[in-house]
Amino acid sequence: MPASKEQTDEMKEAFVLYDIDKDGLIPTSHVGSVLRSLGINVTDAELAKLSNELGDAIDEKKFMSFVSNKLRETESEEEYIKAFRVFDKDNSGYIETAKFADYMKTLGEKLSDNEVQLMVQEADPTNSGSFDYYDFVQRIMAK
């Protein structure tokens, strides 16, 4: 979903505040602070990638595009979390791996045993019997 007018206005306002020289650019080293001021979490790896791609500064158009993409990712992440919460009966943030495998085989689009096994390995790489679905969602969204 595209950014709302309110979100777009907030992004532009934040850009202007951080454009100290008023040259239409902000240092890529400040992008993390700008995003956090907008309530958007970003990893150091994402910031490093952005800096490698753009160099020392980012213009408003690229900034707006980056933030809009980040907002879409965040919305998708929240949708996944909501879906997992349905199966988190005790609100612990964890789901039993065996139950997860059963859900994957029986609900929605039926997955093959091999597909389910791959998903389970990704969800519970240490084979502990349960997994933190917040962490799982962040890992799959990062791919």
Curated annotation (Swiss-Prot):
Signal peptide: none annotated. GO terms for cellular component: cell cortex; cell cortex of cell tip; cell tip; cortical cytoskeleton; cytoplasm; cytosol; mating projection actin fusion focus; mating projection tip. GO terms for biological process: actin cytoskeleton organization; ascospore formation; ascospore-type prospore membrane formation; microtubule cytoskeleton organization; spindle pole body organization. Keywords: Cytoplasm, Meiosis, Membrane, Repeat, Sporulation. It is found in: Cytoplasm; Prospore membrane. Coiled coil: none annotated. Transmembrane segments: none annotated. The keyword Repeat applies. Induction: Five-fold increase in meiosis in mei4-dependent manner. Its main location: cytoplasm. It comes from the Eukaryota. GO terms for molecular function: calcium ion binding; enzyme regulator activity. Residues 6-41, 75-110, 111-143 form the EF-hand domain. It holds the Pfam family EF-hand_7. Disruption phenotype: Cells are viable and complete sporulation normally at 28 degrees Celsius, but form four-spored asci poorly at 34 degrees Celsius. In sporulation-defective cells, the forespore membrane (FSM) is formed abnormally and F-actin localization is aberrant. Only fragmented or anucleated FSMs are formed and F-actin dots remain at peripheral regions of mother cells even during meiosis II. Sporulation defect is alleviated by overexpressing myo1 from which IQ domain is deleted. Plays a role in meiosis and sporulation. Belongs to the calmodulin family. PANTHER family: CALMODULIN LIKE 3, MYOSIN LIGHT CHAIN 1, 3. Interacts with myo1 and pik1. This is Myosin 1 light chain cam2. The lineage of its organism: Eukaryota, Fungi, Dikarya, Ascomycota, Taphrinomycotina.
